[in-house]
């Protein structure tokens, strides 16, 4: 029998088995940060949509490092995060077998984009979701029952979470069905949490009330789907020599004769991508404000810095490729994040106490690149492009036709 002479580490991790398509499109938070009653009441997660990537220039503040006080260029991802709307409150009690839902209370008014989430086919449905439930808020018996529910939640619950949804109409996406999730409320006593949640029923919660500048967060999402792939692409096994009979992008030995089965740990072809993943420790470089109207003027300069005073928005020329324009609040994260453009991402507060110097470093952005991401962009703004190009033929023709 021939065998290889040396052993080697296995290719690919078995920690992510089974490598199959994710059952859910929205990233699921499997554990929220530990509660600390001494802190003020706050939310622990938020939903955003991946718009695209660009790069920034910043000055490093790391005394003792070779790049201290020097400029570095870094890749960043823009995640659009319009305000989320709170539409419900859920109380949990702790049992020996984990958390159990105790009571769920929904708001009186729920928007259609949220109701769509409860239907497979909104167009053909009667659109009756929550019509009976909202009457609770209008008659006296219903109000008494709701007050009773809230008081029993204060008495018995240990964990309070809010049900919040995204606002799809604010985004440049075709989808109308909002994404809905439970977000844990941390900080303060249970009574304070419940009062905080009640005040915000049917209200919008912006991203800057959840996360702060220079904070380290975790990003949960589903990766880009790649379809059915061979073993070399999927597990990064070594290609066999050129003269190998019946193909070389294969595994040479898939196991012994007996046991007469292929072990689960052997690399095989199959689905690659569209897997649920959690990436920890993504640093927030900037929490940007969306377009706003001030004194009758539309303010767009959310990509200006103290060093680059040009009046420009975060959108590159021509918008983000395969996404469009970011007009709402956004979060700028260092490096890349999972998923394709338009993918919904769950941003969660870090589960760990951050102590490393890089995590606590203050970020001082000098420049944000807004050149076109479709080809080799060279202009930061349309004004800069027009000044360089001069009068164009199409402008002259349009002027002549207008005259």
From Swiss-Prot:
Residues 18-31 have a biased composition (Basic residues). It comes from the Eukaryota. The modification N6-acetyllysine is found at residues 136, 286, 294, 366, 373. GO terms for cellular component: cytoplasm; cytosol; cytosolic large ribosomal subunit; cytosolic ribosome; extracellular exosome; focal adhesion; nucleolus; nucleus. Residues 1-37 are annotated as: Disordered. It is found in: Nucleus, Nucleolus; Cytoplasm. The modification Phosphoserine is found at residues 13, 304. GO terms for biological process: cellular response to interleukin-4; cytoplasmic translation; translation. It holds the Pfam family Ribosomal_L3. Constitutively monomethylated at His-245 by METTL18. Methylation at His-245 regulates translation elongation by slowing ribosome traversal on tyrosine codons: slower elongation provides enough time for proper folding of synthesized proteins and prevents cellular aggregation of tyrosine-rich proteins. It is not required for incorporation of RPL3 into ribosomes. Keywords: Acetylation, Cytoplasm, Isopeptide bond, Methylation, Nucleus, Phosphoprotein, Ribonucleoprotein, Ribosomal protein, Ubl conjugation. Transmembrane segments: none annotated. GO terms for molecular function: RNA binding; structural constituent of ribosome. Belongs to the universal ribosomal protein uL3 family. Component of the large ribosomal subunit. The ribosome is a large ribonucleoprotein complex responsible for the synthesis of proteins in the cell. This is Large ribosomal subunit protein uL3.
